[in-house]
């Protein structure tokens, strides 16, 4: 949820689309009937706090019944 820049009421996202792998364009509409402004925001990755290292594939945990999933 984003606040309307004109009246500060809640604005709901109506639709969105990826511009790049790290940037999304989102269309919002103000929920205040007296305003009803429609505006666009951009959401993008600025930096990573933690990046995963090398990922090692492991077997899943056994099911509660004690049975294991068979791999083919």
From Swiss-Prot:
Short name of any one Pfam family annotated for the protein: Ogr_Delta
Listed name of the protein: Prophage late control protein OgrK
Role: Cryptic version of the phage P2 OGR protein which acts as an activator of P2 late transcription.
Signal peptide, first to last residue: none
Source organism: Escherichia coli (strain K12)
Coiled-coil regions, chain positions: none
Protein's GO biological process: positive regulation of DNA-templated transcription
InterPro entries given in the database record: Znf_Ogr/Delta
